[in-house]
Amino acid sequence: MIEELQDYLAKEFNIHFDNPALLAEAFTQASYVNEHPNQGLKYYERIEFLGDAVLELIVSEYIYKRFPELPQGKLTRLRAAMVCEDSFSKFAKECHFDQYIRLGHGEEMAGARERPGLLCDIFESFIGALYLDQGRPAVEKFVQRVIFPKLDMGWFDHAVDAKTSLQEFLQRDGDIAIEYHLVEESGTENDPEFKVNVTANGDVIGEGKGSSKKHAEMQAAQQALDNMRNKNK
């Protein structure tokens, strides 16, 4: 499968990995490693951590230079729309990365290949591997093709960082303490679910669920915004 991925990347993106082991690591889930304990395999978790940071930096610099008139708050909202699970999972699907993930049998049968959280992770880990193998210029070339054109296509026109919007909405009339609390953590290691609530001055104003705490917080903030806007109608 990794050899097929190398051929695909070479043909579609003109990307040639000098160290294929990095690519294999980036597309391997823990469940696959657990089912092949004697092969000395690595899975994507550490390399995903790096890819997430690289993507945030490159996207931040790009929108900072492209939109010199945008204030910090709007830059933050735009970046949050571009650098998030929903966007990254769509990019991964568009790049057909879902076809090359190495999964354990149980995860395969559970439909993990279509799971947005996993697709997001794989996109980030691929970026981490590309950065380690070929450096920042190669990553920039890739995202210039895959991510940045979506700005002109209107992908992010109506996307909003709900946490930032909630903060602006609540604090326009004064300082209000906004806090996010992890209420429940369930699911499995490969398919976790987090439940979070958001409070304003100690009162619960919204709840959310997601495959990460960050995503659950976004959902909680969005529910709080919807509730308050409905009250003001």
Curated annotation (Swiss-Prot):
Catalytic site positions: D52, E124
Annotated stretches, region: Disordered: 205-233
Keyword annotations from UniProtKB, A to Z: Cytoplasm, Endonuclease, Hydrolase, Magnesium, Metal-binding, mRNA processing, Nuclease, RNA-binding, rRNA processing, rRNA-binding, tRNA processing
GO terms classed as biological process: mRNA processing; regulation of gene expression; rRNA processing; tRNA processing
One MF term in the entry's GO annotations: double-stranded RNA binding
Reactions catalysed, as given in the entry: Endonucleolytic cleavage to 5'-phosphomonoester
Domain (RNase III): residue spans on this chain: 6-135
Cofactor(s) recorded in Swiss-Prot or TrEMBL: Mg(2+)
Ligand binding (Mg(2+)): E48, D121, E124
Enzyme Commission number(s) from the entry: 3.1.26.3
Self-association and partners: Homodimer.
NCBIfam families: RNaseIII
Task of the protein: Digests double-stranded RNA. Involved in the processing of primary rRNA transcript to yield the immediate precursors to the large and small rRNAs (23S and 16S). Processes some mRNAs, and tRNAs when they are encoded in the rRNA operon. Processes pre-crRNA and tracrRNA of type II CRISPR loci if present in the organism.
Protein name: Ribonuclease 3
Species for this entry: Limosilactobacillus reuteri (strain DSM 20016) (Lactobacillus reuteri)
